[in-house]
Amino acid sequence: YWVIRWGDESIEGVAQRRDMYMREGCCRMYSEGEGPKRWHKVVLIVPPEQIPTVRAYVEEQNPQGFYPVQSDAFYLELVPQGISKGRGMRMIQQALGLTKAAAIGDRENDKPMLELADFCAVPKSGDPDLQKEVDFIVDSCENGAVADFICRLEQICTQ
């Protein structure tokens, strides 16, 4: 990941996210002009009210080979074309020979996965636009969204 600060978010907030990613081994920091020639994802840390402006700017640049997608209130990610959670879910299904899939997600980057799932849910605290397109709206993440979804799936499977 490349973590880029945009707008008025505090340096401390950016540093905390960076440190979390570095502890997880999925982030490296580079000085300007350094960095890999190939990358997997760029994470822009943006105040939520500025996400539309930053997205419009990125799209105006007509980037070749990647697209912007929001993954959190503060995160706008640039990911390679053709890469999505939906594609990843299908690859896992095929590798394991699964005929059905269930998925839960709360942001725009989860949409391709939710669209392909046989059963899907969004937490109450998730994106309101996604909530309109799913089978279930479950409790918030903080209150056990995944457990709520599993209980609902169990009810469907035992009917």
Question: Where do the language-model regions lie?
Answer:
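Conserved acidic, metal-coordinating active-site core of Asp-based
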Residues: 1-104, 108, 113
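Mg2+-dependent phosphoryl-transfer enzymes with acidic/Ser/Thr/Gly-rich catalytic loops
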Residues: 77-159
